């Protein structure tokens, strides 16, 4: 097996953190939970009918990725001669190992050690039959050794499911820190008591042929989630094929850099009764994976912490609401509360998800990726990124339609019930007294008044302009026309200004931020054309509080209608003494004569002062 030195390693302008893709997704589920091989076969046909959604190499044999998520086929496993206990009392999943025997053994030792730490046993290791002959050159060169693990030792399914999650995260953490040469070839595709995933660096037509298990008539499931990957600006790899552990995703998360950064920042204050030592499973988001994988990591963590699957999805991918798109007051309060806790994972996205019991789909709040659904009279539901993925006679169809922006459609296979968005969101909105919490704790900046006289001039105006990097052109050509005409000034000849980081002159803070790639949409989107899904609302307060435990203390925030403040509003914030709020001024000055060392000392002092005053609203000032 060749070493993947050319894949997934940061080099030149390529960074694996920028992984995005655009794909085909499909879900087929028996609403009443009935299992059959027919569902697996139908799902594979859905995948094959979306072949045009995936990408292939020049050899027409190397795909960007294809996969299927199924319920664990208990009877099929018994027929393989594996003496597993009854359903729900064992965990299983596919694991990708390097083909080097020494590395394989070293990784297996780590796995066994972590499994036994939780009081469990690695009961069996099955070599998954595969058909390597159908692979293209690139896929064959990087093909892992695929094994199916079976873990026993706990009779409580919920407890075992959580233990399996913790074990996998610990193994991933140890592998990332290990010196095993091909450790990046190791990947746990799934490890669960409820679902199993078959996937790889395949194209849609290859999946059933590469994994003979999938064509065995005794392999049954009550639901199936399929995915055909098209990498828009990334390398195909075995580990980045979808579905992931809970979801399959068509689209992009354009806010991914901020989402990852904020999630990493709040890890230190997270705590959950279900996961006593969260430090052991950090980082929650596995490094060097795609945007879809990062979203799946966070979704999986929330569900493992006790949050319901629809609650977690509604929190991560909220729908829009305003005067043009009214929703109930209770649901509005639900979203306002959660907007304080978690920034939206935003971007064009069709999301299908399942944990083995629940299965459903939703769209992003813009609705920029399509998804259609169909329900038959005999209790089958199909959701896919396009119509026509399965053939039905017209008299078989009970209902069909398209998923709406920000709306969820969910099936509970144990209850045998379809939950539409309205019923789901009503349950979520009524779970806590969100409106009361907000009313008692949240402060609206626009409603605060001050008797202080605040001048609308700035002392040392010219000096302050130079200090903050404003040029005459910024004032005369950009800011003044915006203030006078309420429109953004239009210029020609493009922007040929060098990067701010290379300039010898002071630069505006904003000049250091650029688009990472061509973040465009068709049609164009801006706050004027799309005010239905745009918001300038900002919150100031204790952003890093523990988001896993519902608490009205999270609502102790100051709400800003927009981030641009008047002098009066800024003065109110700097002198706030209302509902327990208070503020502290932190000077951001240093002795220029001391050069770089003076700047470093001043920054260290600023950080220390911020830590000491963290219970207050902090604001920096260019004055002592």
Sequence positions of predicted segments:
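Conserved small/polar residues in nucleotide/adenosyl-binding loops
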Residues: 619-623
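Conserved short alpha-helical segments that host acidic/polar catalytic motifs at enzyme active sites
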Residues: 2-553, 566, 574-577
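Secondary-structure boundary elements
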Residues: 250, 615-616
């Amino acid at each position: 097996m060749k070493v993947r030195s050319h894949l997934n390693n940061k080099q030149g302008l390529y960074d694996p953190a920028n992984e995005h893709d655009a794909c085909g997704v499909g879900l087929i589920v028996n609403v009443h939970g009935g299992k059959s091989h027919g569902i697996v076969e139908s799902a594979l046909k859905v995948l094959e009918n979306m072949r045009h959604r995936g990408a292939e190499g020049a050899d027409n044999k190397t795909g960007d990725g294809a996969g299927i998520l199924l319920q664990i086929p208990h009877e099929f496993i018994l027929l393989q001669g594996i003496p597993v206990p009854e359903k729900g009392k064992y965990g299983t999943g596919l694991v990708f190992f390097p083909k080097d025997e020494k590395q394989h053994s070293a990784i297996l030792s780590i796995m066994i050690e972590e499994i036994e730490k939780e009081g469990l046993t690695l009961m069996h290791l099955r070599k998954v039959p595969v058909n390597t002959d159908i692979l293209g050159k690139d896929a064959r060169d990087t093909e892992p050794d695929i094994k199916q693990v079976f873990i026993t030792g706990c009779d409580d399914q919920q407890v075992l499911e959580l233990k399996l999650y913790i074990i996998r995260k610990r193994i991933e953490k140890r592998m990332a820190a290990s010196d095993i040469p091909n450790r990046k070839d190791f990947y746990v595709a799934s490890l669960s008591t409820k679902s199993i995933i078959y996937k790889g660096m395949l194209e849609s037509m290859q999946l059933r042929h590469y994994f003979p298990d999938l064509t065995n008539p005794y392999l049954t499931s009550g639901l199936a989630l399929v995915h055909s990957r098209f990498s828009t600006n990334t390398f195909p790899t075995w580990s980045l094929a979808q579905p992931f552990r809970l979801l399959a995703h068509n689209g992009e998360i354009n806010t991914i850099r901020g989402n990852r950064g904020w999630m990493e920042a709040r890890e230190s204050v997270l705590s959950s009764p279900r996961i006593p030592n969260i430090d052991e499973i950090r980082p929650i988001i596995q490094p060097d994976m795609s945007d879809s994988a990062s979203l799946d990591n966070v979704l999986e963590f929330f569900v493992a912490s006790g949050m319901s699957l629809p609650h977690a999805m509604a929190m991560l991918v909220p729908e829009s609401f305003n005067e043009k798109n009214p929703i109930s007051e209770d649901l509005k309060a639900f979203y306002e509360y959660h907007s304080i806790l978690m920034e939206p994972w935003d971007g064009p996205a069709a999301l299908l998800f399942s944990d083995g019991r629940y299965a459903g789909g939703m769209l992003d709040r813009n609705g920029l990726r399509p998804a259609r659904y169909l329900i038959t009279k005999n209790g089958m539901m199909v959701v896919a990124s396009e119509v026509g993925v399965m053939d039905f006679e017209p008299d078989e169809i009970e209902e069909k339609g398209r998923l709406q922006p920000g709306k969820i459609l969910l099936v509970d296979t144990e209850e045998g019930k379809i939950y539409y968005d309205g019923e789901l969101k009503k349950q979520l909105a009524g779970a806590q007294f969100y409106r009361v919490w907000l009313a008692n704790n949240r402060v609206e900046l626009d409603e605060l008044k001050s008797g202080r006289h605040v001048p609308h001039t700035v002392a040392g105006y010219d000096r302050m302009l130079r200090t903050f990097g404003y040029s005459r052109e910024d004032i005369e050509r950009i800011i003044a026309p915006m203030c006078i005409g309420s429109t953004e000034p239009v210029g020609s000849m493009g922007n040929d200004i060098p990067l701010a980081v290379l300039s010898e002159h002071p630069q505006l803070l904003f000049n250091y931020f650029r688009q990472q790639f061509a973040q465009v949409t068709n049609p164009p989107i801006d706050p004027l054309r799309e005010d239905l899904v745009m918001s300038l609302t900002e919150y100031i307060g204790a952003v890093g509080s523990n988001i896993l435990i519902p608490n009205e203390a999270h609502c102790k925030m100051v709400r800003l209608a927009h981030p641009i403040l008047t002098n009066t509003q800024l003065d109110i914030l700097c002198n706030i003494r209302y509902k327990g709020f208070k503020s502290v001024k932190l000077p951001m000055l240093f002795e220029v004569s001391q050069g770089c060392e003076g700047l470093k000392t001043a920054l260290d002092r600023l950080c220390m002062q911020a830590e000491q005053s963290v219970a207050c609203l902090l604001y920096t000032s260019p004055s002592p």
